[in-house]
Amino acid sequence: STPLYSSAASDVYKRQLVDIIQQIVSGVNRRVNESSPIVDSRLSDGSRVNVVLNPVAINGPVVTIRKFPEYSITMKKLIEIGSISLNVADFLKLLVNAKYNIFISGGTGSGKTTFLNVLSNYIPGDERIITIEDSAELQIQSVDNLVRMEVRQANDEGENGIDIRALIKSSLRMRPDRIIVGEVRGAEALDMLQAMNTGHDGSLSTGHGNSPKDMLNRLETMVLMGVDMPLKAIKSQIASGIDIIVHLGRLRDRTRKVLEIVEITGFNGEEILTNTIYRFEEDNIEGTNKGIVKGKLKWTGNTLINQKKLFDAGYGKEDISYGE
């Protein structure tokens, strides 16, 4: 993991830093100033940039850059470093090809965007894909017909902004085979779910959650941010829209792993029903390699309940392999 560094700077350097910040944000049609002192942006190489200015940043401007690797992370690489096993990767590939709606959850720094990129590269190359992001960072290489859309901030008068909700609604008129929403944080969760429930199968997205159950609760809260809707109706929308949750985690040794794969099986009128297919189990060995976490993502013995999409895509039960 890349360490974080901090440094004290003179007023001259602070002014120079502000100039650099303005160049960065203006290059992607963003703005940051005292009245709007926080912004997320990106560099030309796709690196994520977070900027905080006075008066929020008391000691002066703060710039945090999260760089991407020079090479694209592949599923093969994730298997090599132990983030996922081959049999689970094959299982997810089958689900992507069969157009299951997959939601990736995890905490900050757990690798959600990286994993979304990797899964996206399983999408057949002849499909039309639309990506929608707050700040463009996805690097999908498997499809030629790719439409990328990015949020536009409002101007200083608070006008002419285009948010994720507007982009999702626009994307529905663009005849996509799949819609990929980089991350849902608020009311746009409802629009994403409605897209999933209106024939746009195979859609992918991510969100912050500490567990699959926590992610479902957070999605309920996000939907309520945008509409006054009965909780049962929200739960029903989530249960019918999302097929699979892949939960990622950053462990105490700073490794990133797939911790759980959960199928959403339905709604019983009160609760969203789930079926855990894979779960990470840590080896209980005292003093193992000086704090290195040892364990494996294991099949629970539960099989995929909703198999209709697999059959509709031309697969049979013999094509499903869960591994150990």
Where are these regions (language model features)?
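Active-site phosphate-binding and catalytic loops of NTP-dependent enzymes
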Residues: I24-L43, E127, M225-K232, T255
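Single conserved hydrophobic/aromatic residue that forms the stacking wall/gate
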Residues: T2-A9, Y13
